[in-house]
Amino acid sequence: MKKYIHYLTIAIITLLFTGCTESDDEFFATKAVTVNNKIEVSASGNVLNVSCNFDRILNYGSDAPLDLFLTTTSRSFFFNYSMQKRNTSGNWENYVPTTLTATKGDNFVGSYISGIQQLDALDTTYEYDTDITLSPGQYRVVVEPRIVSLDSQDVVTVTINTTT
């Protein structure tokens, strides 16, 4: 009898996990589009500027443009980037800036920086603009070329694949 219960337990557990996969698309609606040149990085003197602005109505090469707010109900999107500084031995090491000034959008700073684009007051444009004041030295910026909607609850999450 114990052997029968043991086999029955294994069979039930197997049936429960048969339908589980690692694909989020089965559980959450996602939409991925590609639009180039949405993240801009520029330097002037000791100030590095990172910006990312795009219209709420996104033309991405399809016949019908995508209304990001109606699709996601999200007032914010984000992308991640990190910085590295060359040390005295010539090696690149991770650098976390301490002087960030966001004129549009917001930042979340950890081991990398999350640039958060926010929908403007007129609900027409998602905006992000940040200046980073740097001390003398050589720097490089590594940008993850993916912009993702934040807080898309019970609706579609949109991912914008882009270039810098």
Task: Enumerate the predicted regions with their spans.
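Sec-dependent signal peptide recognition
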Residues: K3-I10
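C-terminal motif of bacterial Sec signal peptides marking the signal peptidase cleavage site
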Residues: L16-G19
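Bacterial signal peptide processing site
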Residues: T21-S23
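Short beta-strand segments of immunoglobulin-like
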Residues: N36-A43
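Structural beta-strand segments of beta-rich domains
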Residues: N46-V50
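Short edge beta-strand/loop segments characteristic of extracellular beta-sandwich folds
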Residues: S51-D55
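Structured domain cores in non-transmembrane regions
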Residues: L58-Q138, P145
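Glycine-rich, aromatic-bearing surface loops/beta-hairpins
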Residues: Y126-T130, Q138-T164
